[in-house]
């Protein structure tokens, strides 16, 4: 049975200031770096064999901290990027016009054809995230990969594995540097294919490393 660990990146400057990131980028805050070190300590004894990350800076920063703790190198996969938020990227959430907020809500609510101009649909996000996960099946037997990605991207992936629509990701709370795990099993009496073992685990994060919602 293949086990794949999933980690969301640490808190970023734009997470803290409530700006839309998408595939634009901002660096980890001091809190985000601490979160990354804590999740690294959590997984270093799990026998991780591969660290695969989105090619965006915030995930690469997080992945490097984890890889150093595990004695591994980082491999990038652009399919693990966050949803492309088009013309709204870099914008403070509070600055959106009513029309722009409608674009955003239609997309996250699963309205047919919903997408931000110059951006990506939730269905497109789900397909590329699933392709990235399925690529783990091609790794050598006995591998235990860890993927570092983004909040909406990972939520969309987990939703689709459950047979839910991609926009169900908004019902999953995946905090910065939370840890999830999915397993690929082949069984005559259990559901074959990908199953979710855990999602959004933050047991490794201490109080200073938790976001305001958790506190």
UniProtKB/Swiss-Prot annotation:
GO-annotated cellular components: cytoplasm
EC identifiers of the protein: 5.4.2.-
One Pfam family per UniProt: His_Phos_1
Substrates-to-products reaction catalysed: (2R)-2-phosphoglycerate = (2R)-3-phosphoglycerate
Molecular-function GO terms, alphabetical: phosphatase activity; phosphoglycerate mutase activity
Site residues by UniProt (Transition state stabilizer): 150
Enzyme class: isomerase
UniProt xrefs under PANTHER family: BROAD-SPECIFICITY PHOSPHATASE YOR283W-RELATED, HISTIDINE PHOSPHATASE FAMILY PROTEIN-RELATED
Protein name: Probable phosphoglycerate mutase GpmB
Species assigned in the record: Yersinia enterocolitica serotype O:8 / biotype 1B (strain NCTC 13174 / 8081)
Lineage of the species this protein comes from: Bacteria, Pseudomonadati, Pseudomonadota, Gammaproteobacteria, Enterobacterales
